[in-house]
């Protein structure tokens, strides 16, 4: 979506004036006027165990239970019907956390995915496939074997369960999306460069974002304590990374998705990540659907679209409009304007709005800015304007010429959308290495000094970011000549042993990269911009507890081969 999409969507909308004294950012209404909560959970008496689920997500579950007629009660309380625990929880650990010798009579121990599915379907669903296995020593009679249990689960139940994992997970202490372009940094030393984003190369857990990487929503999981690599998914062609992006489906529902994208962007700039994710899931599902949606029932049948979303789809079909668009807070276009400043994330944009700022001129004259934000504001228009491919080529050649003046054997490759063959680029990422594995050392500082002396580098955003053996520079460049714009440039120097994985990482789209990492994880492997490792040990929450063994990957083709994937040319990684 165009970075200024919301501003374009509402150029003449009359503003709704909020109480000027309010310091709380207005939120999009949770439900339409006159809409009443349904009590379809009235028979539920639940206790939510927060361990593993996380406080924020547990509180969301509890709020939804009460809102829809259910009751919250202690685990040992009379009449408790369901005890909800984290996906990776086993029976004995649950009892220890609850400080109970055994489950209360009539209580069922269920995974949080069951409650997510109930909330998604707006009904109490069967717990088959969601119950925590109870060891036979805790039973008065033998429990059916796992094979018997699996045989009793209707086909498709596991897939439905895995789809529900897109419900809000506990907010992580750091983002679980792949490392993004720098957004905020208090100084030019290496550190998290956004108040909303940070990275160490590989996500610590496969999250809702990873699940978006699967077209079908299919996501194999492993049992606790299973350190053996999981088998590859039965149908690899359901993974984004297994398909060429040239085969993207035609969007038969553009008239619907373009309106939902405005809402998704509005939620995103307001910091409502989970609701934005829900809309993104529905938008992706609609874009992949093989025909135009024509009815409520048809919308409900699409995986990833619930009843409430289906109602919005039908409203658009019947009226050509979505009433929620009329209720978008007046803060949203301003927040989008502010968050487009390089160095300012969602939190900073909200802070500025709460301080009374409403324009870039307000920010320029009144806000306290970091060095990076001041640079981002100075080049605001240039950074938002995508550069033609020819300009990106000139930038790559300028860096290459300067590097090879020190050593003619250095390899310099522009990655990102440029390497994927796009006609325009937002910025340029240049990878530098040397085949001998040694001569790249010491080139980083000398190259930057040379480019500064030429006047090619005009501003430093992050002068040096150490990432293992990789060194990364984030800055601003401008080609010589009248009318040239300032452009974002990243220069990354990597050892040759990591070059293939770095090339793969900095070339693929965010969606493609998430899919590759998620697939690697299902195989007991780990993929980052540094290496592909096997025999990686993870705990029940998906966090690595053993680094595994690094596999040799001389070329990108080796990475695809080791993951059991057909090789995809850079132009086919543009999901």
From Swiss-Prot:
<feature type="binding site">
    <location>
        <position position="513"/>
    </location>
    <ligand>
        <name>dCTP</name>
    </ligand>
</feature>
<comment type="function">
    <text>DNA polymerase that functions in several pathways of DNA repair. Involved in base excision repair (BER) responsible for repair of lesions that give rise to abasic (AP) sites in DNA. Also contributes to DNA double-strand break repair by non-homologous end joining and homologous recombination. Has both template-dependent and template-independent (terminal transferase) DNA polymerase activities. Also has a 5'-deoxyribose-5-phosphate lyase (dRP lyase) activity.</text>
</comment>
<protein>
    <recommendedName>
        <fullName>DNA polymerase lambda</fullName>
        <ecNumber>2.7.7.7</ecNumber>
        <ecNumber>4.2.99.-</ecNumber>
    </recommendedName>
</protein>
<keyword id="KW-0238">DNA-binding</keyword>
<keyword id="KW-0234">DNA repair</keyword>
<feature type="region of interest" description="DNA-binding">
    <location>
        <begin position="466"/>
        <end position="505"/>
    </location>
</feature>
<feature type="binding site">
    <location>
        <begin position="417"/>
        <end position="420"/>
    </location>
    <ligand>
        <name>dCTP</name>
    </ligand>
</feature>
<keyword id="KW-0227">DNA damage</keyword>
<dbReference type="InterPro" id="IPR010996">
    <property type="entry name" value="DNA_pol_b-like_N"/>
</dbReference>
<feature type="binding site">
    <location>
        <position position="386"/>
    </location>
    <ligand>
        <name>dCTP</name>
    </ligand>
</feature>
<dbReference type="InterPro" id="IPR002008">
    <property type="entry name" value="DNA_pol_X_beta-like"/>
</dbReference>
<feature type="binding site">
    <location>
        <position position="490"/>
    </location>
    <ligand>
        <name>Mn(2+)</name>
    </ligand>
</feature>
<dbReference type="GO" id="GO:0005634">
    <property type="term" value="C:nucleus"/>
</dbReference>
<dbReference type="GO" id="GO:0006303">
    <property type="term" value="P:double-strand break repair via nonhomologous end joining"/>
</dbReference>
<feature type="active site" description="Schiff-base intermediate with DNA">
    <location>
        <position position="312"/>
    </location>
</feature>
<dbReference type="InterPro" id="IPR019843">
    <property type="entry name" value="DNA_pol-X_BS"/>
</dbReference>
<keyword id="KW-0158">Chromosome</keyword>
<feature type="binding site">
    <location>
        <begin position="426"/>
        <end position="429"/>
    </location>
    <ligand>
        <name>dCTP</name>
    </ligand>
</feature>
<dbReference type="GO" id="GO:0003887">
    <property type="term" value="F:DNA-directed DNA polymerase activity"/>
</dbReference>
<dbReference type="GO" id="GO:0016446">
    <property type="term" value="P:somatic hypermutation of immunoglobulin genes"/>
</dbReference>
<keyword id="KW-0237">DNA synthesis</keyword>
<feature type="binding site">
    <location>
        <position position="427"/>
    </location>
    <ligand>
        <name>Mn(2+)</name>
    </ligand>
</feature>
<feature type="region of interest" description="Involved in primer binding">
    <location>
        <begin position="420"/>
        <end position="429"/>
    </location>
</feature>
<dbReference type="InterPro" id="IPR022312">
    <property type="entry name" value="DNA_pol_X"/>
</dbReference>
<comment type="similarity">
    <text>Belongs to the DNA polymerase type-X family.</text>
</comment>
<dbReference type="InterPro" id="IPR001357">
    <property type="entry name" value="BRCT_dom"/>
</dbReference>
<keyword id="KW-0479">Metal-binding</keyword>
<keyword id="KW-0548">Nucleotidyltransferase</keyword>
<dbReference type="InterPro" id="IPR002054">
    <property type="entry name" value="DNA-dir_DNA_pol_X"/>
</dbReference>
<dbReference type="GO" id="GO:0003677">
    <property type="term" value="F:DNA binding"/>
</dbReference>
<comment type="subunit">
    <text>Interacts with PCNA. Interacts with PAXX; promoting POLL recruitment to double-strand breaks (DSBs) and stimulation of the end-filling activity of POLL. Interacts with XRCC4; promoting POLL recruitment to double-strand breaks (DSBs) and stimulation of the end-filling activity of POLL. Interacts with NHEJ1/XLF; promoting POLL recruitment to double-strand breaks (DSBs) and stimulation of the end-filling activity of POLL.</text>
</comment>
<dbReference type="InterPro" id="IPR037160">
    <property type="entry name" value="DNA_Pol_thumb_sf"/>
</dbReference>
<dbReference type="InterPro" id="IPR027421">
    <property type="entry name" value="DNA_pol_lamdba_lyase_dom_sf"/>
</dbReference>
<keyword id="KW-0239">DNA-directed DNA polymerase</keyword>
<dbReference type="Pfam" id="PF10391">
    <property type="entry name" value="DNA_pol_lambd_f"/>
</dbReference>
<dbReference type="InterPro" id="IPR018944">
    <property type="entry name" value="DNA_pol_lambd_fingers_domain"/>
</dbReference>
<dbReference type="InterPro" id="IPR043519">
    <property type="entry name" value="NT_sf"/>
</dbReference>
<dbReference type="GO" id="GO:0006287">
    <property type="term" value="P:base-excision repair, gap-filling"/>
</dbReference>
<feature type="compositionally biased region" description="Acidic residues">
    <location>
        <begin position="194"/>
        <end position="203"/>
    </location>
</feature>
<keyword id="KW-0808">Transferase</keyword>
<dbReference type="InterPro" id="IPR036420">
    <property type="entry name" value="BRCT_dom_sf"/>
</dbReference>
<dbReference type="InterPro" id="IPR029398">
    <property type="entry name" value="PolB_thumb"/>
</dbReference>
